[in-house]
Amino acid sequence: MTAEPILSPETAIAALSGEDNQIRYYAAWWLGKHNVQAGFTALCVALFDERYRIPSGGYPLRRQAARALGLLKNPQAVPALIAALECDEDLRLREAVICSLAAIGDKRAVTPLLNLLQSSQAQPYEALIEALATLQVWSARPQIEPFLQHYSERVQCAAARYMYLLTQESEYIERIVKNLNHDNMYLRWAAVFDLGAVAHQQAVQAILTAQVPNSLKLLNLKRILEAMLNNNSVNHEKAALLFGAIDDLLIQL
């Protein structure tokens, strides 16, 4: 029997319990994309559904369910997400879970995340360090500072982001800005997102001249502007410059 097209929350929720893995994956994406809070329970079930497993050992549906729960930002998902951290077979699933816990921002995630950081097993360190920064877990500084020398430049950037948010010292921002001109396109993209996440106003010009798509520049300049406008002491001159830069980028898109 042909599966019903996913055109509504009801059909998406029903599809999650179906047999077609591709449709189930799309249904999880659809529920997150459209912020369907009614899909919360079905997504929590899908988070532990091991039927869809690829030859390399990963669980695509579980990953997508984790991402969708992060988009819903429902704190009731935190216990399920924490339990999903225990899956050692799929680090990409663990990475998706960590990102969603950071997006929800519930402090119940702090201890499990610290346990992962202190584990002797390899972890998705970039996501883990970024999550601890988002949750403002500054007690992790002794464990995170050594990652400034990690072999992965993206992990180094995550550590620099954490250290800047903690100390506000410009040396850490400079480490991120340096990667805006890196030969690796994905590292340039990661650096732009790091600068947007810390809302560093002095990085605006560096973002504008970086070799990244205008859509990424626009997204992260908007994040910096929003952070600036939420600040009680807005620098109106800098805000005006940001508005102008955003307008110019919109025209170019």
Swiss-Prot record:
UniProt superkingdom: Bacteria
Keyword Lyase in record: yes
SMART domains reported for this sequence: EZ_HEAT
Stored InterPro entries: ARM-like (IPR011989), ARM-type_fold (IPR016024), PBS_lyase_HEAT (IPR004155)
GO MF term (any one): oxidoreductase activity
GO cellular component entries: phycobilisome
UniProt keyword Lyase present: yes
Gene3D superfamilies: Leucine-rich Repeat Variant
Keywords: Antenna complex, Lyase, Phycobilisome
SUPFAM superfamilies in alphabetical order: ARM repeat
Functional summary from the UniProt entry: An enzyme involved in the biosynthesis of bilin.
Family, as annotated: Belongs to the CpcE/RpcE/PecE family.
Protein name per UniProt: Bilin biosynthesis protein PecE
